[in-house]
A protein has these predicted regions:
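Short, charged, amphipathic alpha-helix that recurs within catalytic cores of restriction-modification
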Residues: 107-152
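Active-site beta-strand-loop-beta-strand hairpin of nuclease catalytic cores
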Residues: 91-101
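A short acidic/basic microdomain associated with nuclease active sites
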Residues: 67-89
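Conserved alpha-helical elements of sugar-nucleotide-dependent glycosyltransferases
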Residues: 58-62
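Short His-Asn-centered micro-motif
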Residues: 80-82, 104, 135-140, 162-163
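Charged, structured surface patches that assemble and position nucleic-acid processing machinery
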Residues: 150-163
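Interdomain/boundary linker segments immediately adjacent to catalytic/signaling cores
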Residues: 1-57
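Acidic/His-rich structured neighborhood in mature extracellular/periplasmic domains
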Residues: 100-108
């Protein structure tokens, strides 16, 4: 299933970014094998060239997967179209009215020294707007293993760290 996703990314990479994103949303939202995609999305494959369109699309798919996960637990959710300086996912409770903004992160396994700025804790707090919650979703093995500013920042800014 994950290989089908990578082939889909390769197929749509020549489209305009918004159109490619729409194609990938359809692929993820309408896929009955969603759990296979969910299990693999956290690490950018080394076969994807650094700073390429495919890498940007893979990162966008991680946001699409997060949005689908929110839908699976009963929230209304969408991937936001705005690029740069905003959260990537918005979700809202159907029953309780609370809302949240979120960002999903994917890193290469070969990238060992992640900078605290890569996690954008402060930015997520600023992008919260009128939403009650801000969430960063990242595979547990990609979070820093030792002391890191992201943990104190997430506490100070009330940003939830999901894995």
């Amino acid at each position: 299933m994950f290989n089908r996703l990578l082939k889909k990314i390769n197929k749509v990479k020549s489209l305009e970014f918004d159109k490619a994103t729409e194609e990938l949303e359809n692929f993820v939202y309408n896929n009955s094998n969603f759990l296979y995609i969910l299990g693999e999305i956290g690490a950018i494959p080394e076969s994807i060239e650094h700073d390429s369109t495919e890498e940007k699309l893979f990162s966008k798919v991680s946001d699409i997967v997060l949005s689908r996960a929110f839908i699976e637990i009963g929230l209304n959710s969408e991937v936001l179209k705005q690029r740069g300086n905003s959260a990537d996912v918005f979700a809202e409770s159907k029953f309780y009215g609370y809302s949240l903004v979120a960002d999903a992160k994917s890193f290469r396994m070969s990238r060992t020294a992640k900078n605290q700025k890569d996690f954008k804790i402060n930015s997520l707090n600023n992008w919260r707007g009128n939403s009650e919650y801000a969430i960063l979703c990242n595979p547990y093995f990609q979070y820093p293993k030792k002391t890191s500013q992201i943990y104190s920042q997430s506490m100070n800014y009330n940003v939830c760290l999901f894995s």
